[in-house]
Amino acid sequence: MNLRLLTLALAAVAAASPVDIQERQLSGGNELRDGSCKPITFIFARASTEPGLLGISTGPAVCNGLKMAKAGQVACQGVGPKYTADLASNALPENTSPAAIQEAQDLFQQAVTKCPDTQIVAGGYSQGTAVMDDSIKRLPDNVKEKIKGVVLFGYTRNAQEHGQIANFPKDKVKVYCAVGDMVCDGTLIVGPAHFTYLGNTGEATQFLLGKLSASSSSSSSSGSSDTSSASTSAAADSSSSSSSSSSPFGNLGNLFGGL
């Protein structure tokens, strides 16, 4: 791979994808570390050479979409500064650096420890997809369970991982690979198709919102079921107690199957 050409290409897409001042301010990027707990935590790893913690393209777009849909309920956290989003790390065995993988794992762990009631959604773009893949598959089960959905744009490990994240539910992952994006075919060849994913951020946001909604509905149903079971159990205990008190043999009748 020609790293110089890749650098020029990524610089060009950065210049072609401006984010206005209001959007930059809305995006934040270090809100898990520095802010208060929110019902939803979005953790994102940017593409190579993108500045900031969320980057300047797909990361802020999804963050802002979540915040507009769930006003006041979302904390957005980018992976960095140990994840430097340098070009050379793409050529490493895991397609990113060990430091980046560990930092992402630490952020997921921090979200669960600091904010035990938060629901986590995540995403990555280009090298950032490798950061997500390599970190999530190594997490303990109790942390994975808190992650409700993951969106991956230009998945650099798509071929190696067969379009999913190892050791993680496939239905929680949405991969966006544009036609002609050779990065998704297991190469490090970057062409124009790799810079088209802003057009997928609206759909990706809806995917994450759907996973959050499904999780909330499941929790509500579980709570209702538990309440109903408790009520039924209490009623049965009350009935049993009433029957026992009216019998001269108390609970002895139960020893014979109610005969």
Curated annotation (Swiss-Prot):
Q: Where is this site: Transition state stabilizer?
A: 48, 127
Q: Where is the signal peptide?
A: 1-16
Q: Which Enzyme Commission numbers does its entry carry? A: 3.1.1.74
Among Pfam families, the record links this protein to: Cutinase (PF01083)
Single GO cellular component annotation? extracellular region
Q: Which SUPFAM superfamilies match?
A: alpha/beta-Hydrolases
Q: Which SMART domains match?
A: Cutinase
Q: Which GO terms describe its molecular function?
A: cutinase activity
Task: Kindly state a single biological-process term from the GO annotations of this entry.
Answer: carbohydrate catabolic process
Reactions it catalyzes: cutin + H2O = cutin monomers
Query: Which keywords annotate this record?
Result: Disulfide bond, Hydrolase, Secreted, Serine esterase, Signal
The subcellular localization recorded is: Secreted
Q: Which InterPro entries match?
A: AB_hydrolase_fold, Cutinase/axe, CUTINASE_1, CUTINASE_2, Cutinase_monf
Disulphide bonds annotated for this chain are: 37-115, 63-76, 177-184
Annotated region described as Disordered, given as residue ranges? 215-259
**Enzyme active site:** 126 (nucleophile), 181, 194 (proton donor/acceptor)
Q: What does this protein do?
A: Catalyzes the hydrolysis of complex carboxylic polyesters found in the cell wall of plants. Degrades cutin, a macromolecule that forms the structure of the plant cuticle.
Q: Which family does it belong to?
A: Belongs to the cutinase family.
Q: What is this protein called?
A: Probable cutinase 2
Origin species: Aspergillus flavus (strain ATCC 200026 / FGSC A1120 / IAM 13836 / NRRL 3357 / JCM 12722 / SRRC 167)
Upper classification of the source organism reads:
Eukaryota, Fungi, Dikarya, Ascomycota, Pezizomycotina
